[in-house]
Amino acid sequence: FYADVIDIGATTVVILAGTNDIAGNTGPMSIDMILNNLKSMTGIALANNVKVILCSVLPAYDYPWSPNKNPNIKIPKLNSKIKKYAKKSGVHYLDYFKALDNGNNGIDKEFSYDGVHLTLEGYKVLEPLLENALKKVTK
């Protein structure tokens, strides 16, 4: 985080993290462990006068490469905690989940080729949301 944000003199950071942790890509992690990582990054940013946009984790009904991790249940729980923390810490919360949720805590094929990774159309949904958040945070 230091090398990617602080050391380069960034004035704003967009933090979108957590789905790989829920999938267990680097080993098991609890929702609270993931939240603590996000809190650490946010705290470091704020301590260095970097504005923060804290994003929700994108919806995923399941992970094709790591089944039975229940992301459709865990991601909404994590997002609720992220939103609460963002409000408490005074940083902007960007709700990508709501924009892509197909009503089943997943993403439709139009927006994701595997239910996790976005297609160009998926990124087109997120782009105006991020642009709006950046305008609010950097004004």
Give names to the regions the model predicted:
Residues 1-139:
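Alpha-helical cap/lid subdomain in secreted, periplasmic
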